[in-house]
């Protein structure tokens, strides 16, 4: 017969052997001391269970396969991008331009033309037309890519591009590609289109990073035209039979040197996923003319839980510090942490007009409850918050003083700022910013302003529910 005491001692030793180094990892590597404390307490209470949870959800870093396989620069998309300070950037934004350049290691590019595409009604036809026009290559990355409705049209367009000889690569985040029954991943495979899923959740070596997702939306045609923004390929954003019921979003078409930053981002993600390094020939011949396409100075910002950690946070906080007159934030999820709350409040207290526009009808109730639990912390310092009624609004945009804007995939929540791979573009262009301010103002004017008094007047049960949801903001 086995000795119960011996088994107990063995189990205790195993628990300690696992729990002690796990707790040590949390103490050394977790950046937030409150987070480290909570993990250590959980591991102390549940040595094996807490250690397992920490291994799955507590290690928020991702080892880049692309960096390991190909540490050198790819001449197709990686040129000398040491940050420089163009004279075209006005003095109030020189510090911000320097900050983002230091954070990203990329220079501002001139001569870009950036065009906003409002909702699926404008974005999807423009993207489909670009795919149909592709001569050399199509590179598409999407967080969600449905196979039905508008997604079926994209699958067909990609299949036709592949069949006429263009090189096509499609990258979809694994969670949505593998676990959604309507994902386009299998439809693309059946059509013979080269497709892959980012960070597969079924690979044991990557289980610790299963919650780190690729939220980027990129489309590059022939290395000349790019699209990025907040738009997934998803039927709720395409309702030609009832356009008033379609969800809202903002996407952008880009031409000019900044498209190389989209190419670089896709190249790294594709190589990281498949091991295939896209060569210079993949993108086709460079444009025959070097004439400038437009007047925007722009720079791509890759951010994620790898070497690019915190780039988006630094950009947002730097922009808030640079603001002199106005800050407009358009986001589907407004769940800022304490440093971001302090930066927003500081800007408002300096006399800057700070406005936040977010949907009244969210697609994730828990996130919306947590967001409303944060409202009072910025409202009391002069930040104004507006909730847009009607269909869900997935738009993502930041505007400063009518001169600078930041567009792309990132939200104002912990998942975008720390856990997801995101891609944004910062743009210095008064004309574009003015146009985008008009879009923001129109949506804001159709929205309801939230007051601190109204928040306090809500039933206690609702406030408790929201407060409990707020406890989970680090992972929402």
Residue ranges of model-derived segments:
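N-terminal localization/anchoring segments of enzymes in phospholipid and broader phosphate metabolism
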Residues: 1-314, 318, 322, 346, ...
């Amino acid at each position: 017969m086995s000795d119960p005491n011996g088994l107990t001692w063995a189990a205790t030793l195993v628990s300690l052997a696992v729990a002690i180094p796990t707790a040590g990892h949390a103490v050394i590597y977790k950046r937030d001391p409150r987070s480290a404390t909570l993990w250590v307490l959980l591991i102390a209470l549940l040595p094996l269970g807490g250690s397992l949870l920490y291994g799955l959800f507590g290690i928020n870093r991702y080892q880049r396969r692309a960096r390991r396989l190909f540490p050198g620069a790819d001449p197709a998309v990686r040129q000398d991008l040491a940050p420089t300070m163009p004279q075209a950037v006005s003095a109030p934004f020189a510090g911000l331009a320097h900050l983002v350049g230091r954070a990203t290691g990329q220079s501002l590019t001139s001569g870009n033309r950036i065009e906003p595409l409002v909702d699926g009604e404008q974005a999807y036809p423009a993207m489909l037309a670009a795919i149909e026009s592709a001569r050399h290559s199509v590179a598409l990355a999407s967080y969600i890519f449905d196979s039905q409705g508008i997604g079926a049209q994209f699958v067909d367009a990609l299949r036709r591009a592949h069949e006429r000889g263009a090189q096509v690569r499609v990258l979809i985040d694994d969670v949505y590609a593998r676990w959604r029954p309507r994902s386009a991943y299998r439809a693309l495979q059946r059509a013979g289109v080269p497709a892959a899923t980012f960070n597969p959740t079924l690979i044991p070596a990557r289980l610790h990073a299963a919650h780190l997702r690729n939220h980027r939306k990129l489309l590059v045609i022939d290395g000349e035209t790019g699209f990025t923004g907040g738009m997934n390929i998803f039927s709720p954003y395409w309702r030609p039979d009832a356009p008033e019921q379609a969800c809202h979003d903002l996407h952008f078409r880009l031409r000019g040197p900044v498209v190389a930053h989209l190419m670089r981002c896709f190249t790294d993600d594709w190589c990281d996923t498949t091991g295939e390094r896209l060569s210079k020939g993949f993108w086709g011949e460079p444009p025959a003319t070097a004439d400038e396409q437009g007047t925007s100075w722009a720079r791509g910002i890759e951010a994620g839980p790898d070497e690019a950690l915190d780039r988006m946070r630094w950009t947002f906080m730097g922009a808030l510090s640079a603001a002199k007159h106005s800050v407009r934030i358009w986001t589907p999820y407004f769940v800022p942490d304490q440093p971001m709350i302090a930066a927003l409040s500081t800007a408002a207290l300096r006399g800057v007009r700070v406005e936040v526009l977010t949907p009244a009808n969210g697609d994730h109730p828990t996130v919306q409850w947590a967001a409303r639990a944060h409202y009072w912390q910025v409202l009391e310092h002069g930040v104004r918050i507006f909730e847009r009624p009607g269909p869900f609004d997935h738009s993502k945009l930041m505007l400063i003083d009518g001169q600078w804007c930041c567009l792309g995939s990132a939200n104002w929540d912990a998942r975008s700022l720390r856990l997801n791979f995101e891609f944004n573009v910062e743009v210095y262009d008064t004309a574009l910013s003015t146009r985008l301010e008009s879009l923001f103002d129109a949506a804001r004017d159709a929205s309801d302003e939230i007051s601190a008094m109204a928040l306090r007047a809500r039933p206690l049960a609702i406030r408790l529910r929201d407060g409990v949801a707020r406890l989970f903001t680090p992972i929402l």
